[in-house]
Amino acid sequence: MGLFPSLTQEIAIDLGTANTIITSNGRIVVDQPSIIAIDTRTEKLVAIGEEARKMHERTHDRIKTIRPLKDGVIADFRAAELMIRGMIKMIPKRRGSLFKPTLKMVIGILPT
């Protein structure tokens, strides 16, 4: 935690094969399935997390769902980036915060 905890927002992201969890100042603020849906014609993001999970194997031919992580490792970097960016946007804005969020990252190098 920073010098003025009420003015800062620290974010931690746990990328999991099944779910991605984002915490802000020690509290879970995002807990979503690790999946995205993209439009195959435009390559644009259509849905993230729970919304994308609901589309999995039930959508139009143009919509493809992707699970960016496999066996605990990033299998599709572009999809992982889209998912992370989208989930960061899901974080509720902290009232009174004067500074941009600080991202805390832990990278595991051993299988769990």
What are these regions (language model features)?
Residues 1-112:
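Nucleotide/phosphate-binding catalytic cleft detector across ATP-hydrolyzing
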